[in-house]
Amino acid sequence: MFFDHCQCKIAAPLYNQLCTNKTNVSTYAFCYYAGAYMAKIKIFSTAEQNSFESPPVFNSIERKRFFTLPLALTASIEKFKTPTNKVCFLVSAGYFKAKNRFFARQFHQVDIEFISKQIGINPDDVQPNKYNKETYRRHQKIILNYFGFSSFDTLAMVFAKTEVDLMVQVQFRTKLILLEIIQVLTRKKIALPNYNVLFTLITDMVNQY
């Protein structure tokens, strides 16, 4: 069969889109166009990707909901030394509560001001650019532990690859695969990684078929 000779191993539906008359398309031409298609796979639109990679934008009701944190968590800040560490920790916890992921030390100023007011800190004393990576990593562990989540580590990657592999066998629409693996990781209480990790995972698996 034609597909037995095509090293790019792409699904038949794409081939049918490229040409309605298979006898007029060479194996090499199909592989070239299929390869070009795979190289240009785009799952989320630019706007969707930016939204996924950015902290949530809350309205006033959502802000109260997600930044109303349990006493056991807010009490953790008593041992933190600086206003920046205290506020950034609580904002990070609120973002995680809403989205099950962290946002690489990105914070909306309105959220910093809201949390600062809650705990009696002057917002001007909060400097997110001085919230260092090591402190942020320690805070992530506290937040993950409180919410009962695990980080997206090597074991999580193996699990995600297995799940995506099963999805790719029955679903060729990459966006649906992405949305589903997000739900699977959330149900397993695994913190979501960034978009590029999921994008690479899915496209690598798709390219194997």
Label each residue range with its predicted role:
Residues 6-8, 19, 31:
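Cysteine-centered motifs
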Residues 30-209:
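Long amphipathic alpha-helical coiled-coil/heptad-repeat bundle
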